From Swiss-Prot:
Protein name: Elongation factor P
Similarity-based family: Belongs to the elongation factor P family.
Gene, per the UniProt record: efp
GO BP, one annotated term: peptide biosynthetic process
PROSITE patterns hit by this protein: EFP (PS01275)
CDD domains registered for this protein in UniProt: S1_EF-P_repeat_1 (cd04470), S1_EF-P_repeat_2 (cd05794)
Length: 188
């Protein structure tokens, strides 16, 4: 289906010259002089080659039909990351390059949205927020409760993040999966 270039977002899949590309970043640029353009950074699905394209914001681009379905993460092995469709119990192996930065956040039994095109996995989408325990951080410093400074911390999944000074080792915290940033203490 043809769509206007300015409506494309990260994660969309476009068909360019008969090849499928997943959009990594999409930015609408409005220069002071001249016509506005949409800058797209894309990765070719077949071989992982990254390209950059510019389209006029009103230009038509062919968007590929992609099926988004919830899948349950099962396990990881030499073949990749294995997910199961909870409706049909069908299993699918997703290569590590498709999982990408989401790998440390995957937990057995968690539900993710898996995008496929003709049965080929393209992208996975994690829940926006997840809860983890802090396994290592500096000790709590008294008197720094009102300060806006942050200290480094290591989460139970191996990801490093920054947390406020009042958070200590063993505390469960909510993290944004998009960038690994601290949101709040877990309320559980």
């Amino acid at each position: 289906m043809k769509v206007i270039a300015s409506t494309l977002r990260k994660g969309n899949v476009v068909d360019k010259d008969g090849k499928l590309y997943v959009i990594l970043t999409a930015e609408n640029i409005h220069p002071g002089k001249g016509t506005p353009v949409t800058q797209l950074d894309m990765r070719r699905i077949t071989d992982g080659v990254k390209i950059s394209e510019r389209y006029r914001t009103t230009e038509q681009v062919e968007r590929a039909f992609v099926e988004d379905r919830d899948h349950t993460f099962l396990y990881q092995d030499g073949e990749g990351y294995h997910f199961m469709n909870p409706e049909s119990y069908e299993q699918i192996a997703v290569p590590a390059d498709v999982v990408g930065d989401a790998a440390p956040y995957l937990q057995e039994g968690m539900t993710v949205t898996l995008s496929t095109h003709n049965g080929v996995p393209l992208t996975i989408e994690l829940p926006q927020r997840m809860t983890f325990e802090i396994v290592e951080t500096e000790p709590v410093t008294k008197g720094q409760t009102a300060s806006s400074s942050y200290k480094p911390a290591l989460l139970s999944n191996g990801v490093k993040t920054s947390v406020p000074p009042h958070v200590s080792t063993g505390t469960r915290v909510v993290i944004m999966t998009a960038d690994g940033s601290y949101v709040e203490r877990a309320k559980d």
